[in-house]
């Protein structure tokens, strides 16, 4: 009988402690800011912009890491015929960002982005500014993407025919594609990519 009483008391104590624990957890969760409880994008534009800005930051990092006297660097020792030099890669990505989001807005995109377009930027500071301007523009336009216009048709020679949502995704992919290429340009010049340095990765990027 004593054993049963002790067991019953232990069970009651356990239930009481569990209730107290749950109450404490509930109080802690309700005291947290709303952003910490549900820190996810609240719109279609936000769902893409975080990844776009991350890709842009990575690309800008490699563009800034390469010394200006290496902006004319072209890989050798393999099948690199007719590839762009480092500076041309940066200019191409900047031009493409303007092109994609010009098409998003129904505007005429710049011509010849394959070669960097007609923007006169040539020096490293000029190309970095051109790149930053293109990123600022793309984020400004992306902010207008909504559930109502996401599937609107977009025409254009760069990413059309497509939808506004689709062309936004293409813009993210395009930056990451060229980021991967420029990582090799940096490493061929003995430079560790900034993102690798930041996270101290031992292999890969």
Residue ranges and their predicted role:
Residues 1-4:
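Positively charged n-region of N-terminal signal peptides that target proteins for export
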Residues 23-47, 95-158, 189-205:
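Short, helix-capping/interhelical loops that line the mouth of catalytic, cofactor-
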Residues 49, 53, 57-60, 72-115, ...:
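Short, contiguous alpha-helical
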Residues 7-16:
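Bacterial N-terminal signal peptides
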Residues 12, 65, 92-95, 133:
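Residues within well-ordered alpha-helical secondary structure of globular protein domains
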Residues 54, 58-61, 65, 137-144, ...:
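Solvent-exposed, charged/polar functional surfaces in cytosolic regulatory/catalytic domains
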Residues 33-73:
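N-terminal targeting signals for Sec/Tat export/insertion, comprising classic cleavable signal peptides
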């Amino acid at each position: 009988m004593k054993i049963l009483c002790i067991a019953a008391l232990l069970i009651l104590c356990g239930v009481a402690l569990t209730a107290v624990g749950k109450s404490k957890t509930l109080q802690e969760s309700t005291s947290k800011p709303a952003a910490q409880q549900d820190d996810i994008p609240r719109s279609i534009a936000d769902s893409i912009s975080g990844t776009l800005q991350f890709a842009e930051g990575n690309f800008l990092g490699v563009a800034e890491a390469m010394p200006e006297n290496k902006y004319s660097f072209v890989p050798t020792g393999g099948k690199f015929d007719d590839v762009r030099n480092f500076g041309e890669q940066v200019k191409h990505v900047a031009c493409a960002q303007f092109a994609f989001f010009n098409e998003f807005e129904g505007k005429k995109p710049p011509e010849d982005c394959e070669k960097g377009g007609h923007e006169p930027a040539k020096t490293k500071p000029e190309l970095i500014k051109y790149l930053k301007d293109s990123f600022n523009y793309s984020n400004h336009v992306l902010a207008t993407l909504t559930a109502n216009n996401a599937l609107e048709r977009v025409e254009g020679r760069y990413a059309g025919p497509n939808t506004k949502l689709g062309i936004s995704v293409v813009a993210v992919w395009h930056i990451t594609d060229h980021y991967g290429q420029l990582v090799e340009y940096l490493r061929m010049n003995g430079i560790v990519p900034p993102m690798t340095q930041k996270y101290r990765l031992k292999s890969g990027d």
